[in-house]
Amino acid sequence: MIEEIKSQIHSHQKVMESIGQELSPKIAAVVELLADALGNGKKLLVMGNGGSAADAQHLVAELVGRFKMERRGLPAIALTTDTSILTAIGNDYGFENIFSRQIEALARPGDVVVGISTSGTSKNVYKALLVADELGCRTIGLLGRDGGTIAEIVDVPITVPCDDTPRVQEGHITIIHILCDLLEKRLFGERR
């Protein structure tokens, strides 16, 4: 058991190293994209399924509340939280439309839409990102494996290069924390 624990920690460290080496430029680009949009009165809409839904909510909580810095709240919405909306759309239009229908209702040109998918192939996330693009939104994919079909349609794909879902999720939450930290500094300076 001890060796398995060490092996999993080693796998985690390898993923973190690859994020630092391979994804830093894309993470920096997303910070700039978000700073530009949020600094100009646009909002962020975030979605995902399962653990990725939890990550979407985590990202939004850090932006609407605060990450490390006392500051005004930032306009961000998790499309994963309203069970009445999710079940109404799922029942009437199908599960593949639970996010795209919300994007139709809430997104405006210049808003930023983030789809989180460890596989890069979640059909409901894919469809919502297509709708977001049609509406003139900027799109970001927080993905895993090879990025899947979602990587092909977003403005900025950030793909954690790993096939192991738990390691991808650990990478996603690390990237989310980095984004929140750098975004606060970019928008509000170095104050605490």
Swiss-Prot record:
InterPro entries the record matches: GmhA/DiaA, Phosphoheptose_Isoase, SIS_dom, SIS_dom_sf, SIS_GmhA/DiaA_subfam
Function: Catalyzes the isomerization of sedoheptulose 7-phosphate in D-glycero-D-manno-heptose 7-phosphate.
Keywords: Carbohydrate metabolism, Cytoplasm, Isomerase, Metal-binding, Zinc
GO molecular function: carbohydrate derivative binding; D-sedoheptulose 7-phosphate isomerase activity; zinc ion binding
Miscellaneous: The reaction produces a racemic mixture of D-glycero-alpha-D-manno-heptose 7-phosphate and D-glycero-beta-D-manno-heptose 7-phosphate.
Cofactor: Zn(2+)
Gene name tied to this protein: gmhA
Subcellular location: Cytoplasm
Chief location: cytoplasm
SIS domain: residues covered: 34-192
Pathways involved: Carbohydrate biosynthesis; D-glycero-D-manno-heptose 7-phosphate biosynthesis; D-glycero-alpha-D-manno-heptose 7-phosphate and D-glycero-beta-D-manno-heptose 7-phosphate from sedoheptulose 7-phosphate: step 1/1
Native species: Geotalea daltonii (strain DSM 22248 / JCM 15807 / FRC-32) (Geobacter daltonii)
Entry EC number(s): 5.3.1.28
Superkingdom of this protein's organism: Bacteria
Protein name: Phosphoheptose isomerase
Reactions performed catalytically: 2 D-sedoheptulose 7-phosphate = D-glycero-alpha-D-manno-heptose 7-phosphate + D-glycero-beta-D-manno-heptose 7-phosphate
One Pfam family this sequence matches: SIS_2
Record's cofactor remark: Binds 1 zinc ion per subunit.
